Every structure is written in C-alpha cells, then in structure tokens.
C-alpha cells in the first residue's frame, strides 16, 4: 500500500505528467455528411488568419496615414504577408507555449513580415481582431444563407404555380377540415421563407459592425479614425460603443434568426412527412433508381430527407441558447462567450446551409399525386362541406344552434361510414324546411372553396 501511494504521488508531480499534444480542433464539428464546402471554407483556419491579417494591415494603413507609424512599414506589412499562406501548425506550436491564439498569430506574422511587425497591433486588443473577424465571417455566412433561401423560394414558387388549382384536403388537428389547393400549401411556405429572408437581411445588418477601440473601448491608445478605416475596408460599420467587445445582443439576434429559419425548414419537412404516409400519399420524396429504403423490407420508400431535415433543424435551434446566454458578460468583458462562439458560429451556419440546400432539392423533385388528393377529398363523403351547409341554413332562417345540430346529426353517421352526407340531408325533414334538394346540392361545389386562390397568390407572389 505504501509503495502504491508513493507511486501515485510521484506520478502526480508536474515533471512526471505526460502532456498531451494540443491539436487544433476543426472549425466546425459538423461532419462532412452535413456540410458544404462553400460554407465550411468561411470557417477554415486559413480563412480566419487571412481576415485577422487584413484587419491588422488595414489598421496599420490608417495609423500610417495619421502619422503614427511610418508609411513604409505599412507598405511592407502588406507586401510581405498579403499573399502568404499562414502556417497553421506553426501558429499552434506557438500557442501551446503562449496559451493565447492572437499572440501566437502575431508572433507568426512577425516571422513573415520581419522588423516592421513591431508596428502591427499598435493600440489594439485581441478582441478588436477576434470580434471584427467573427462579424466578417457571420456576414459572409449570412450572404450564403440568403442565397440558399432564394433557392428554396424559387423551388416553392415553381411548384406552387404548377399546382395552383390542384384541390386537396386541408387538415386541422390532423383531421379533414375543408378543401384547399396543393399550390396554397406551397404558397404558405413561400410566404414564410420570404419573411425568413427579410429577417436574415436584418440579422446580417445587426452583426455587420467593427470594433477597433482598444482594451476597454475608450480609444485611449488608438484613434477612432482607425476603426472607421478598418470598418470601411472590411465592409462593416463602426460599432457605436463597445467595451472590450462588440455587444453580444447583436449575435443573439443573429443566431435566434437562424433558429427561426430552422423551424421553418422543419415545418415544411414535417408537412411532407405527413403527406408521404402510406394512408395519405399525396406527395412523396423522389426515390432514385437503385435507392434502398430499408435493410430488412425491400418495399420501403421512406421520407428520409425530410426526417433528416427535422433532426438538423433541432441542432440549429440548440445553438440559439448559448448565443442568448453570451449576452451576459462581466463588466467590460470576460471570455465566457468565446468557447461557445467557436462552436456555434461554424456549426449553426454550416448546418443551416446544408439543410436549406437539401430542402430546395427536395421541393424541386417532390413527387405529387393529385389523384390521391382527390381520393382523400372524397373519403368522408362530402363532410368537408359542412360549414357551408351550416351557413346556408342560418341564411334561410335557422338559428345557428339549430343549424349546427341539424348538420352534425347528419354528419356523424357518415363519419362512422354509414350513408352519404348529401342523401341524408335531403331525407331530413327538418333540413328540408329550409333548403331544397337543389340548394343542398349547391353547397357541395368544390370550386366554391377555391374562388379566392388567385387573390391569395397575388398577395403572396405579386401581380406577375
């Protein structure tokens, strides 16, 4: 026991511990299966270091114009590093010693630039670089996501007009309600994603700010004109007032917007999943030649893309909570937000980018079955016209309570599969006190429910 205790004490001494190598984690933990290179490239280390350099170099330009540093120094910084490929492994090596990523980068930059590197980062703090870079990346990600939404909108519009007047049953609580058209279902989604696009444009604007204001945001060591120059060069605007960091309520709004968009993705995906159920089969995901639906059941054709989108949407929404909690920082700044942002920035944007592109393709190739829609419309023997009969009876003098009772007592047998709704109504003496056979038949006109589809489409898509 004594020997064992001594061994434990020896192994716990600092000089006896084995230090595990610090490996650079991927900028996005999303697996390649759910990633697209267009978005992941925004978050690659080389991209980040390139942005860091541009921020530092533009700041040096401004300092040179103000006479703070020699103009030749600013020119040398650009000349020696603007086309450089930064050595990620070398930066990691330096960071293992310094325990500071920005210092590690600046040390490596000095190895590239030489003596003039002493004029880099003058009057700045790490967050000036980190926050401005993060916002550049979020803006670029937003631009790509806006383009993704445009693809979804284009697919929805095409299919909506294709099935503008294709009648189908509308459902509330999952139960047959009244007729709609399949085009209207897609128009609903089009309007929702149009709103999503508007919100994302606003969210992009919200994070398109730059802070080059020094250690606590007072510009004590750097002229505010440097911030203005860097902001203009990076496609941003100066943050009106920062502490050591850009306020995180901006980022919270950005990620909350991504979460709402993810919910819109899931809403449409869930609709498709329901419509593909065997008992419904009004629409179906495209099933390619050679595709397999089940390892056990060769007949299966499952809505796997929609189900996949449901899961990815959950992930995007999960990233919203850390963004909201990052708003709360100590005094002029703490670092509690940093670790969360290093994950949620890449992961939320990469995931949503993939989901939107998958959704656009799903809509574009969606198989639609109007004949099954008609079968489902007829399935309840005309019960979907019950509200019109209710209104017709009240207009002929029946109280609403009596009209409701008369329609319901004839509807319930049909609900149980006993008889035809129209025939039962025609044989109900109390109903016949108010409506003739012809008037009853007129209430079963499917076209009546679709008479304002054109109006709705003009509201959603415009006059064209």
Residue spans for each PLM region:
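Intrinsic disorder/low-complexity segments
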Residues: 1-26
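A helix-coil-helix interface module used to build multimeric assemblies
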Residues: 26-219, 223-229, 238, 291-294, ...
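Catalytic-core signal marking the mid-to-C-terminal active-site face
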Residues: 29-47, 97, 104, 295-464
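Short amphipathic alpha-helical segments with heptad-repeat character
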Residues: 50, 139-150, 157, 187-190, ...
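Conserved hydrophobic residue
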Residues: 69, 74, 280-281, 399
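A structural signal for small-residue-enriched, beta-sheet-centric alpha/beta enzyme cores
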Residues: 218, 231, 238-245, 374, ...
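Acidic, glycine-rich loop-and-beta core segments that form the ion-binding/anion-interacting portion
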Residues: 227-320
């Amino acid at each position: 026991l004594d020997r064992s205790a001594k061994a434990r004490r020896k192994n716990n001494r600092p000089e006896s511990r084995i230090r595990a190598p610090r490996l650079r984690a991927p900028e996005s933990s999303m697996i390649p299966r759910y990633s697209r290179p267009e978005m992941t490239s925004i978050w690659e280390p080389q991209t980040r270091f390139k942005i860091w350099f541009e921020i530092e170099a533009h700041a040096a330009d401004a300092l040179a114009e103000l006479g703070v540093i020699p103009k030749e120094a600013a020119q040398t910084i650009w000349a020696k590093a603007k086309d450089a490929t930064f050595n990620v492994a070398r930066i990691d090596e330096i960071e293992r010693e310094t325990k500071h990523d920005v210092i590690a980068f600046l040390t490596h930059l000095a190895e590239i630039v030489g003596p003039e590197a002493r004029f880099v980062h003058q009057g700045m703090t790490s967050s000036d670089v980190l926050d401005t870079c993060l916002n550049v990346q979020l803006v670029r990600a937003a631009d790509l996501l806006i383009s993704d939404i445009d693809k979804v909108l284009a697919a929805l519009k095409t299919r909506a007009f294709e099935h503008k007047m294709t009648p189908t049953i509308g459902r509330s609580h999952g139960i047959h309600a009244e007729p709609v058209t399949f085009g209207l279902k897609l128009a609903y989604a089009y309007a929702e994603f149009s709103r999503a696009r508007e919100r994302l444009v606003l969210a992009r604007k919200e994070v398109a700010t730059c802070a080059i204001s020094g250690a606590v945001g007072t510009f004590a060591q750097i002229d505010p004109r440097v911030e203005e120059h860097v902001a203009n060069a990076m496609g941003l605007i100066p943050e009106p007032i920062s502490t050591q960091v850009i306020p995180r309520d901006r980022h919270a709004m950005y990620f909350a917007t991504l979460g709402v968009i993810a919910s819109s993705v899931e809403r449409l995906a869930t609709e498709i999943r329901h419509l593909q159920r065997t008992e419904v089969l009004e629409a179906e995901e495209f099933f390619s030649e050679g595709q397999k639906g089940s390892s056990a059941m060769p007949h299966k054709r499952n809505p796997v893309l929609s189900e996949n989108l449901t899961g990815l949407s959950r992930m995007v929404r999960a990233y919203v909570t850390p963004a909201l909690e990052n708003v709360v920082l100590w005094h002029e700044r703490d670092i509690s937000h940093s670790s969360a942002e290093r994950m949620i920035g890449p992961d939320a944007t990469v995931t949503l980018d993939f989901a939107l592109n998958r959704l656009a393709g799903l809509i574009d190739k969606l198989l639609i079955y109007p004949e099954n829609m008609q079968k489902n419309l007829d399935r309840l023997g005309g019960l979907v016209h019950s509200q019109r009969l209710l209104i017709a009876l009240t207009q002929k003098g029946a109280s609403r309570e009596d009209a409701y009772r008369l329609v319901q007592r004839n509807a319930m047998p049909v609900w149980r599969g006993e008889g035809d709704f129209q025939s039962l109504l025609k044989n109900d003496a109390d109903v016949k006190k108010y409506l003739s056979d012809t008037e009853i038949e007129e209430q079963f006109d499917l076209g009546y429910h679709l008479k304002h589809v054109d109006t709705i489409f003009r509201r959603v898509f415009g006059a064209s």
